[in-house]
């Protein structure tokens, strides 16, 4: 299993809306993530800095990257553009983090 972590931003006035939209996420999005090998996906909110810290375990980079081309992911990204910064393709602006410590 490959562990990934990344940081995104949420608009300062959208903390509650961001959380509402994720509780729960669309069932079809959850199904796509799982069918593409994503496990133990969690997102944490740092309210003071408007940051989202996400962790996920994936089975392969190829399968994880393929999620982006699914219709449900494209619709989700568009749905989220009013609550967080997005790239021109509507994907969330994000920065991947380098793992520096892990205690199994």
Swiss-Prot record:
Amino-acid positions noted as binding substrate in the UniProt annotation, renumbered to this chain: 18, 41, 76-77
Entry-linked InterPro entries: Dimeric_a/b-barrel (IPR011008), L-rhamnose_mutarotase (IPR013448), Rham/fucose_mutarotase (IPR008000)
Active site (catalytic residues): 22 (proton donor)
One Gene Ontology CC term in the entry: cytoplasm
The protein's name in its UniProt record: L-rhamnose mutarotase
Catalytic activity annotation: alpha-L-rhamnose = beta-L-rhamnose
Record SUPFAM superfamilies: Dimeric alpha+beta barrel (SSF54909)
